[in-house]
Swiss-Prot record:
Keyword Aminoacyl-tRNA synthetase attributed: no
Locations listed in the record: Cytoplasm, Cytoskeleton
Protein name: Actin-2
Family indicated by similarity: Belongs to the actin family.
Gene: act-2
Source organism (scientific name): Caenorhabditis elegans
Length: 376
């Protein structure tokens, strides 16, 4: 079906960033925000060639005059027209390829609605005329990238966090847990606690500034109470950040209070369990015989696991929950921000995977529901 000389395209559409590139590469060629921006004001300069919408980095750079929208919320596509724009931008502007010449591997969140992947399939074949495509589950790809076939993946991105136990390459659906608490919620929370300090951030453009503060300055405390005491008694934890207009702000205990919400969702007014408890609950839903392997292979993946200190804190929290003799190992690969994409690149270039693609012919015969039979 698929010639060896044509590289497959791997597109990992995250809620926050889109990662795209060619199968067989060790990193994505294009990484850009999953944003579509539309002008807030009428264009007045004639002949300026203003567009009615901007995608990705261009939207980001013109954010002052645009309203920014994320078409993927909590890992699920909520606006298909905008999603199509992002894919179009990915193929034609970022990768500069003709999608009708390459098989495309897409990714999706676990426990995604079935209609969501059908629609993805339909758009790929009908709008972009791809010769073949496949939809893979993000967490499974992360595990591939870490060189394992058994383990539990805590995948936390911008829109959704999930814990996915995988045994010998099979995700165990009954034990997958999903937590709608991720990077975007932490950004919103940081906006809120910075407002309490007297800095006001409200617009969609300012939210992007706060996201940058979060990525550059936040970290996870090993002992939250102790860290709060340290922050209160000295200024050793304070850092300054220069805003785009040159104003300098000081950030103190917000640096670790923001990601602490991952472990204590009550900070955000949520009743759910933290990421440590969710991982533990997920392991406990698995067969007793495989738990040992899961505890010893807990893999972190996604941008929201990039905070310094998060692996040590997870180790501490899970050790407290697990049986006392259990060996617990948290694996936090340095490239975990892109491990979903890397796993996709590995998968799509395996010779054994080539018969797994859904071909245009199969799609024409069966329609979009083919995706449930071929991708699992």
């Amino acid at each position: 079906m698929c010639d060896d000389d044509v590289a497959a395209l791997v597109v990992d559409n995250g809620s926050g960033m889109c990662k795209a590139g060619f199968a067989g590469d060790d990193a994505p060629r294009a990484v850009f925000p999953s944003i579509v921006g539309r002008p807030r004001h009428q264009g007045v300069m004639v002949g300026m060639g203003q567009k009615d919408s901007y995608v990705g980095d261009e939207a980001q750079s013109k954010r002052g005059i645009l309203t920014l929208k994320y078409p993927i919320e909590h890992g699920i596509v909520t606006n298909w027209d905008d999603m199509e724009k992002i894919w179009h931008h990915t193929f034609y502007n970022e990768l500069r390829v003709a999608p009708e010449e390459h098989p495309v591997l897409l990714t999706e969140a676990p426990l995604n609605p079935k209609a969501n992947r059908e629609k993805m399939t339909q758009i790929m074949f009908e709008t972009f005329n791809t010769p073949a495509m496949y939809v893979a589950i993000q967490a499974v790809l992360s595990l591939y990238a870490s060189g394992r076939t058994t383990g539990i993946v805590l995948d936390s991105g911008d829109g959704v966090t999930h814990t996915v136990p995988i045994y010998e390459g099979y995700a165990l659906p009954h034990a997958i847990l999903r937590l709608d608490l991720a990077g975007r919620d932490l950004t919103d929370y940081l906006m809120k606690i910075l407002t309490e300090r007297g800095y006001s951030f409200t617009t969609t453009a300012e939210r992007e500034i706060v996201r940058d503060i979060k990525e550059k300055l936040c970290y996870v405390a090993l002992d939250f109470e102790q860290e709060m005491a340290t922050a209160a008694s000295s200024s050793s934890l304070e850092k300054s950040y220069e805003l785009p207009d040159g104003q300098v702000i000081t950030v103190g205990n917000e640096r670790f209070r923001c990601p602490e919400a991952l472990f204590q969702p009550s900070f955000l007014g949520m009743e759910s369990a933290g990421i440590h408890e969710t991982s533990y609950n997920s392991i406990m839903k698995c067969d007793i015989d495989i738990r040992k392997d899961l505890y010893a292979n807990t893999v972190l993946s996604g941008g929201t696991t990039m905070y310094p200190g998060i692996a040590d804190r997870m180790q501490k929290e899970i050790t407290a929950l697990a049986p006392s003799t259990m060996k617990i190992k948290i694996i936090a690969p340095p490239e975990r921000k892109y491990s979903v994409w890397i796993g996709g690149s590995i998968l799509a270039s395996l010779s054994t995977f080539q018969q797994m693609w859904i071909s245009k012919q199969e799609y024409d015969e069966s329609g979009p529901s083919i995706v449930h039979r071929k991708c699992f």
